């Protein structure tokens, strides 16, 4: 539980009182006995000293505002004495004396109106510890290892790949070990603790280790010694090893299912899911206000939005509510199924039951996963039946070997309004299948034959289903990395799909550049999607999200819109009819090609897409399209264009020409500068009026970054450009939105601090704390302020939620 940012109104001196509200019972001294409470939690008392200085400035600002008001407050706030005074805690005294609105010690502390205690207080820490203890008791006491992991680690250590026989009844897993440890470090630790054992195995990068004992006496003694032992500030947990020959009727069954792993909120009603997500977003807004208060420079007044956050219950801005998804079941248009072994050791296509880092290796079929469409689930079943009889092995994540790795199913729907979940499924018109394999060490001829059989299996399975499953394109992706997340340039191969025609077999060949794609629709626009391009997984709800973003951006014909991290151009293209010009930035060349193709398909001519990392070009683009507009119109632009074209490489220069369709775009009436080749730049026949920059009165940026958030260079470019007054931030990870907003909204320091070079090396530092540190080095510039926020449920049944926030200055 985090330190509360909720404060009460400072009372005018003439009306202050020490008498608590009559409705609140005094707290007996016995309930706050320090001896009975656990030791201090360092996480709960984060930056206590910094809070005092910020609160002092807040008090001074509030006091000034209240002294100028004629209104007198005669009743103490319900938050009176509900938080501990940081001055009193540190100095054993406070300048406010008995009139301080904060509690001077545990005896004065009152319970908050929401029936919680100050998290930095002893009672708050005790409540947190009890809650964590209850949570740990509910956790599984088994680790979903299979013998595959034990054999892999054993083979690695043996050097020759030999496998020893392991008695699982005499084996235990040690959870919460340092992930940098290997078997030698684990054995050394066991020896230091005086633990006798038969074998001990540990792989770097995992937090679990595997220990086998000689007999039951050794096992019992080892458990007594190790259970709860502290290692690097973490408490060890002893867990049983779940054998892959696990009997589903076993009385020990308490295994998390694929449904629980993928859709953890599916057990709740949808209304309860929405309420839980709205509350979670509210906590993020409180976190933003709390961290902004800490980040503000000493000696400066806090921003008004921080001071008024207490009037909103601690929220940095108003939370407008949550937008629900029109469809809640089978809504995902992209599903990535892992290939591995089930608990029974059978090759399985489905979802992993947990984190690989935590030692979870089992894969379960996507049965009863409400976010997966029936079509995707059927294709997973078809693929599983095929690999069960394949001569090639499934991927072994421990030995980094094998052939079959992953199946991705992408779906494209017809346009229209979806009235229910079933209607959304029946509108699926196109399907792309992408099978990820590792070709390392495989015979080329055998692979070619296997791929032919694979295409035949998918085609026959699709035709045998009732109704027939759509199958538009089949792609194979070659990837040999450790993780299944392949780089954007991983080799792709389109397979011919055999089709049946009047009893004869014919082959339909496809072209990798023109046919390896499907189409979907958003706001009646048709979008072309390549195998690896990003596209919102819930297009129906994405329409609502983009509509909100456009409304909040206050768009108009004189607006220049920057679509940062634009993907296939969905945001910019859906809003293009409302603005003068759209500049999209995306690092994925395939997605940029799709964006340009999508503009052509829909006849949109006022969009330009740049293929590059946003942090590399954002600053130059802002100068190119904004700074030049302030120059005198009479000034020749040919030289300026030459310089700017040198700064910003064209799409063709940054990608292979076969992936880019920019040259096919119709000419734009508002596009101010084409990314020209050298001959065009040197031509003297250009008419001056065609190269003149339009005067955009309104400049807006909409950012939709990946879960990692915006790069610091992008944040700096957005923050320091004076022409950019409005920013709409769309985030699938509210945690990173908060971190980025801290840098965007914190007032500038009088003298920017270059910071401690070793700051990144601090252990267990949160992204919010790192953002506060980076804010110190932000160049002097006007800060944004959060205006309003909205939650949008793009992912029903999961604990993820999209968040959109409007920032202005």
Swiss-Prot record:
InterPro entries registered for this protein in UniProt: Methyltranfer_dom (IPR025714), MeTrfase_TrmA_AS (IPR030390), Nucleotide-bd_a/b_plait_sf (IPR012677), RBD_domain_sf (IPR035979), SAM-dependent_MTases_sf (IPR029063), TRM2_met (IPR045850), U5_MeTrfase_fam (IPR010280), Znf_CCCH (IPR000571)
Assigned EC number: 2.1.1.-
Modified residues (N-acetylmethionine): 1
ZnF (C3H1-type) residues: 79-107
Record-level Gene Ontology MF annotations: RNA methyltransferase activity; transcription cis-regulatory region binding; zinc ion binding
This protein's record includes keyword Chloroplast: no
Region (Disordered): 1-74, 652-693
UniProt-listed GO biological process terms: methylation; RNA processing
Protein name (record): Zinc finger CCCH domain-containing protein 24
Originating organism: Arabidopsis thaliana (Mouse-ear cress)
Taxonomy of the source species: Eukaryota, Viridiplantae, Streptophyta, Embryophyta, Tracheophyta
């Amino acid at each position: 539980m985090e330190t509360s940012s909720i404060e009460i109104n400072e009372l005018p001196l003439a009306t202050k009182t020490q008498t608590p509200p009559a409705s609140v019972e005094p707290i007996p001294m016995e309930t706050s006995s320090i001896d009975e409470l656990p030791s201090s939690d360092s996480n709960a008392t984060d930056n206590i000293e910094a809070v005092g200085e910020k609160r002092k400035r807040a008090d001074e600002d509030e006091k000034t505002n209240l002294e100028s008001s004629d209104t007198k407050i005669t009743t103490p706030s319900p938050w009176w004495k509900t938080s501990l005074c940081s001055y009193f805690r540190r100095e054993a005294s406070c300048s406010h004396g008995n009139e301080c609105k904060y509690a001077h010690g545990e005896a004065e502390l009152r319970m908050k109106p929401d029936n919680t205690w100050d998290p930095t207080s002893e009672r708050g820490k005790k409540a947190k510890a009890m809650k964590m203890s209850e949570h740990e008791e509910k956790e599984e006491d088994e680790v979903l290892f299979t013998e595959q992991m034990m054999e892999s680690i054993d083979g690695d250590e043996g050097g020759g790949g030999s496998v020893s026989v392991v008695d699982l009844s005499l084996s235990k897993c040690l959870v919460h070990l340092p992930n940098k440890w290997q078997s030698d470090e684990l054995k050394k630790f066991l020896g230091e603790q005086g633990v006798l054992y038969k074998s001990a195995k540990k792989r770097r990068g995992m937090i679990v280790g595997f220990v086998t004992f000689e007999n039951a006496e050794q096992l019992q003694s080892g458990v007594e010694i190790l259970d709860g032992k502290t290692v690097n500030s973490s408490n060890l947990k002893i867990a049983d090893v779940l054998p892959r020959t696990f009997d589903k009727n076993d009385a020990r069954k308490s295994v998390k299912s694929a449904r629980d792993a993928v859709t953890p909120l599916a057990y709740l009603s949808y209304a309860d899911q929405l309420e839980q997500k709205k509350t979670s977003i509210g906590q993020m807004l409180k976190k933003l206000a709390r961290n902004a208060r800490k980040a503000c420079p000493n000696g400066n007044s806090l921003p008004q939005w921080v001071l008024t956050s207490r009037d909103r219950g601690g929220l940095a801005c108003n939370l407008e509510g949550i937008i629900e998804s029109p469809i809640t079941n089978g809504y995902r248009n992209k599903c990535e199924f892992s290939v591995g072994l089930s608990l029974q050791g059978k090759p399985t296509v489905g979802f992993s039951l947990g984190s690989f880092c935590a030692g979870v290796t089992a894969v379960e079929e996507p049965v009863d996963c409400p976010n997966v469409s029936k079509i995707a689930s059927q294709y997973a079943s078809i693929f599983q039946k095929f690999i069960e009889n394949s001569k090639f092995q499934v991927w072994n994540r421990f030995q980094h070997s094998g052939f079959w790795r992953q199946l991705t199913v992408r779906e494209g729907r017809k346009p229209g309004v979806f009235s229910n979940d079933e209607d959304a499924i029946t509108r699926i018109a196109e399907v792309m299948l992408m099978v990820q394999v590792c070709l390392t060490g495989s015979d080329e001829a055998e692979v070619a034959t296997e791929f032919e059989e694979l295409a035949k299996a998918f085609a026959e399975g699709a035709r045998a289903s009732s109704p027939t499953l759509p199958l538009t394109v089949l792609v194979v992706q070659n990837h040999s990395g450790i993780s299944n997340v392949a780089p954007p340039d991983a080799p792709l191969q389109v397979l011919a799909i055999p089709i049946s025609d009047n009893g004869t077999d014919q082959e339909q060949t496809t072209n990798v550049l023109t046919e390896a794609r499907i189409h979907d629709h958003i706001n009646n626009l048709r979008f072309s999607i390549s195998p690896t391009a990003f596209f919102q997984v819930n297009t129906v709800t994405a329409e609502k999200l983009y509509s909100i973003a456009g409304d909040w951006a206050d768009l108009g014909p004189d607006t220049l819109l920057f679509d940062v991290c634009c993907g296939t151009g969905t945001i910019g293209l859906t809003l293009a009819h409302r603005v003068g010009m759209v500049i999209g930035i995306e690092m994925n060349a395939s997605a940029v090609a799709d964006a340009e193709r999508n503009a052509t398909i829909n006849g949109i001519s006022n969009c330009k897409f740049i293929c590059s990392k946003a942090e590399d070009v954002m600053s130059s683009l802002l100068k190119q399209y904004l700074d030049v507009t302030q120059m005198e119109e009479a000034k020749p632009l040919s030289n300026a264009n030459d310089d700017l074209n040198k700064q910003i490489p064209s799409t063709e220069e940054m990608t292979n020409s076969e992936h880019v369709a920019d040259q096919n775009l119709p000419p734009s009436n508002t596009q101010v500068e084409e990314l020209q080749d050298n001959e065009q730049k040197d031509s003297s026949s250009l008419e001056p009026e065609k190269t003149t920059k339009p005067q955009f009165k309104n400049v807006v940026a909409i950012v939709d970054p990946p879960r990692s958030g915006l790069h610091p260079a992008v944040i700096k470019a957005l923050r320091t450009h004076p022409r950019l007054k409005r920013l709409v931030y769309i985030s699938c990870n509210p945690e990173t939105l908060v971190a980025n907003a801290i840098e965007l909204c914190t007032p500038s320091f009088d003298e920017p601090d270059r910071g401690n070079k070793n700051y990144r090396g601090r252990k267990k530092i949160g992204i919010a704390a790192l953002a506060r540190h980076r804010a110190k080095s932000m160049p002097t510039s006007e800060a944004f302020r959060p205006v309003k926020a909205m939650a949008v449920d793009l992912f029903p049944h999961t604990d993820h939620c999209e968040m959109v926030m409007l920032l202005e200055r």
